[in-house]
Amino acid sequence: MAPLFTGFRFGFGRGAAAETGGAVNATGGTKTTYGSRTIHTFTTVGDATFTLENGNLPAVQIMVVAGGGSGGSRHGGAGGGGGMTYVAEPNGAINAGTYKVRVGAGGTATYAGTHATKGDWSFFGPTGTADWPTHVMAEGGGSGGCYSSNGGWSAGANGGGASGESSYPNPQQAPNSPAPTAFGTSVSKSGADGGGGDKWGTCPDCRLGGGGGGQAGNGGPANPGPATGGAGFQYQIAGDPNNNYYYGGGGGGGAWGQSGGVANGGHNPFSAGAAGIGGGGGGGSSQISPGGGKFGNGGASARNSGLDGSQGANSSGGDGGANTGGGGGGNGQSNYVSWPGPTNKGGAGGPGIVVIAYPTP
């Protein structure tokens, strides 16, 4: 469940003073308008500033989405969707000053047998050290498990899926995110769990990775598979029907196998998991056509859809969509006779986004 904040009083007293006289003016990010509201959208990974001069902004709406985790490769679990924090309070306000904005990167795509990485934090707040309760913050998504790692490799706002060749095929459990209680009554829940993997001998011989957790749903387990990613959470900016997307979808779990099956010296064919809506990347399948399972589709209904996984000896998990916080897709393995292959990777996590909207002064 994504965070819902009520009774929020947004008055950051620690922003650097910027009043110089004249009309109220805010700068930073890409500045657009919709109806009677002004919107600042920050999409570039890294640090930026939001500066407000000559007064305060009432009825502020803020959305912060962190980077998604990357998917594992070689029996890979999928990356979890990035965390999301939003603030929508008619009585909230931002005081004049300069504030720091950070857009978190998605987890890095890694090769077969190399541990996937967690997504980075995103935040908005004063220019000092970012922390609760002075900042609005969202934690990056957890990374997916790979061969020999237990569960998802790094915990995050939403859990990464477990590996399909793990001694502990249970999913990560999503931690609770702290809430900015200094600003008023708040309700916060960070997200969802990654799906469990299905290791050798239990399917039999599936070795499927679990789906990544999304902001609005758990990642699917590998058994019964395919391991789909959890759904992201839908959030509308400034009442704009064209700015109403899902964010933080989990990636789809990877699959391993060969079309010949165990009787012919290969591995049973199974399909990789589709990603959750909200920009997750689809799972990759190392199975060879014809007769094998297929790759998983990327998650749509997002600012930028997640990419599909790919299939075959050079398979990879799909990347999470740009500025969605979608988790990367897990990948199966390169050709089962010779691994790891030079191009087999889990999907990268999608970068996050920060959006600020308010009534046009």
Model-predicted regions and their roles:
Residues 2-361:
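Low-complexity, glycine/proline-biased repetitive segments and flexible coils/loops
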